[in-house]
Amino acid sequence: MPFVIVSGLSGSGKSTALRTLEDAGFFITDNLPPELWNAMHDLVTARGIENVAVSTDTRTREFLAALEPSYVRLSRRREDLRVLFLEANAEVLLGRYNLSRREHPLGETLMVDFARERELLAPLRGIADTVIDTTDLSAAQLSQRVMHLFRLEHAFTLRLLSFGFKHAPPRDADLVLDVRSLPNPYYDETLRSKSGRQPDVAAYVFRDAEAEQFYGELRHFVQTAAERARASGRHSYTVGIGCTGGQHRSVAVAERLLRELQASSIETELMDHRDMREGGEPT
């Protein structure tokens, strides 16, 4: 994996690019002067860290004079050295700054700052392997471009959580589903004290064609929602599945979804059966 130097104009998306690399497992250092690039290489190499990304921009302008010798030395030591430079037109940068209300690192009027910044960073742009114009890119699109550029796998996990509505829906769920229309094992005395993890309870929940149809449509909806979340750049998506008490139906549905979605292309895990009690009725 490469040693990546990320640079570019303020507001062009450097933070998004760094965050994308960090989420992909890179060791990240922001605002590192060129004079310290080689020291960083020594540090991470000594600790066996292979995936490294650093950013350098006009916040370290006092040190940019050391750019060329630092780059030449590092490029001789790292055959996998990559330089990514981000830019955008002045109007878009101005709009982004107006939204963020941040002060430009050069501290002058913004349009003057942008012109001066381009001048200061011209040497970095000149050594860049890749220049990305983010004028027409959203943060999610830029993240996808960075993932593609470095051939990174986008880590995504679908998390399932069963619960009982009488205990309140989970606050951290991205999507809450109601499965109370499924057959309720609570009304079968032989099943009441069991949980939806047990085969005879699950068989009761999915006992007829209507229940199977309901489950099939629910699974398709969950899978579609997860795929769209992954495509948008999300790294996780939490689905809460609720019945009345959180003991039977929601547990059975969550367990079945877990088994079937794990066999698909979506990494799926069970967070918790929040309100289930093994060997007893739900509280």
From Swiss-Prot:
Molecular function terms, GO-annotated: ATP binding; GTP binding; molecular adaptor activity
Similarity field: Belongs to the RapZ-like family.
One Pfam entry name: RapZ-like_N
Function: Displays ATPase and GTPase activities.
Listed name of the protein: Nucleotide-binding protein DR_1434
UniProt-listed Gene3D superfamilies: P-loop containing nucleotide triphosphate hydrolases
Binding site for ATP: 8-15
InterPro entries hit by this protein: P-loop_NTPase (IPR027417), RapZ-like (IPR005337), RapZ-like_N (IPR053930), RapZ_C (IPR053931)
Residues that, per the record, bind GTP: 57-60
UniProt-listed PANTHER family: RNASE ADAPTER PROTEIN RAPZ
Chain ranges passing through the membrane: none
Keywords associated with the record: ATP-binding, GTP-binding, Nucleotide-binding
